[in-house]
Amino acid sequence: MPVTIDPRRHSAALFDLDAVVTDTPLDSTVTLVRQLQGIGVGTAVFSTNRNSQGVLTATGLDHLFPVHVDGLASGKVTILVAAANRLMAQPGRCVVVAVDAAGITAARYGGFALVLGLVIGEDQTGHRDTLRNSGADTVVADLGEVIVRTGDRRMSELPDALQTLGLTDDLTARQPAVFFDFDGTLSDIVDDPDSARPVPGATEALQKLATHCPVAILSGRDLADVIKRIGVPGIWYSGSHGFESTAPDGTHHQNDAAEATIPILEQAATQLRDQLGPIPGVMVEHKRFGVAVHYRNVARDRVNEVAVAVRTAGQRNALRVTTGREVIELRPDIDWDKGKTLHWVIDRLHHAGTQVGSASLMPICLGDDITDEDAFDAVRHTDVGGIPIVVRHTEDGNRATAALFTLDSPMHVSEFTERLARQLSDTQR
């Protein structure tokens, strides 16, 4: 399966010196580093036993790596974290490229986002197995196998939807179908997830909008939880990132392939509660199709400990690990996400017959988090094209996004929703 370095999810890439300087020069490694720098992903070299600066200078590669960290006395975890810190990146947003079991293990136990094993030498089969067994997410023989996602823009570069997005002409030709995330989009992010509520005016705006066009909520929360918090009838609700949904008529749907993981997730939740319970501020949220571990209230020097525990549980239980705003989550390892859920809802709207015809839907998607990027991709790649809007924040830095427009806060989402409902009312008179 191809592996992708994605600037929406990854802020930096840390390379073992032995992955960069080899007996046989690897042009693909240099090409990869230049691609990463071209999209704003920082690069660093780490080594436990060599003068990396001298080696890079001697090989003419020093200009590719502004950061290099050596440490004869330090463990590899310490070196990796130091390299991430010098690039001003959190380990949970870093890729590590390592060539041996020690490097892979250190990256896994450092809580790094993506751990790539690079096979060097003759015994590729045995080496691959060693790297995989040490915890590598993917093992490659050449870094030319790594895909670099391009074409996204940084959140700060996007125009504000309230100021620049004019929909009047589109509304006469195409009917919107509007998809909303909940936390960070309709609700402010709060220290206690259980206290999250829609911002003032959001529920009323959703009710107005739903009288004029299809509306859907795509949330990572449990389905029953998000329905209770919003409480607007006659709209679509999808919980657990789309693994479970209800239609406006109350019909229940779920991803049957994920049902077998329900007891596995329950077991993982119990294990994580026991393991992480002594860490002040951690919250383990068990959902029907997921386990979310919130660390917003955890001391910064213990966040990596939380991430390591969750990633280890994911590998142990064959579950997918995803991240979000101060949360790391386990879910079924199935090819399903908010983007596929969005397509699934649109297909059902087409089959049901919309007011202006199945070819004329205009999907609009609003979200703030990494998991919403799958829906943004889906909106942009629908046959008719749509409008992805990211709700801006700084918790992931000025990260890249597939969105085309931005809004500054959930209050602005409420205002945008109210304005869209009003425009539709005027158009449909």
Swiss-Prot record:
Active site: D181
Species the sequence originates in: Mycobacterium leprae (strain TN)
Binding residues annotated for substrate, in chain numbering: D181, F182, D183
Stated name of the protein: Trehalose-phosphate phosphatase
Function: Removes the phosphate from trehalose 6-phosphate to produce free trehalose.
Entry EC number(s): 3.1.3.12
Family, per entry: Belongs to the trehalose phosphatase family.
Disulfide bonds: none
Cofactor annotation: Mg(2+)
Reactions this protein catalyses: alpha,alpha-trehalose 6-phosphate + H2O = alpha,alpha-trehalose + phosphate
GO BP, one annotated term: trehalose biosynthetic process
Gene: otsB
NCBIfam families: HAD-SF-IIB, T6PP
Pathway annotation from the record: Glycan biosynthesis; trehalose biosynthesis
GO molecular function, one term: trehalose-phosphatase activity
Keywords: Hydrolase, Magnesium, Metal-binding
Keyword hit for Metal-binding: yes
CDD domains with a match to the protein in the record: HAD_TPP (cd01627)
Positions annotated to bind Mg(2+): D181, D183, D368
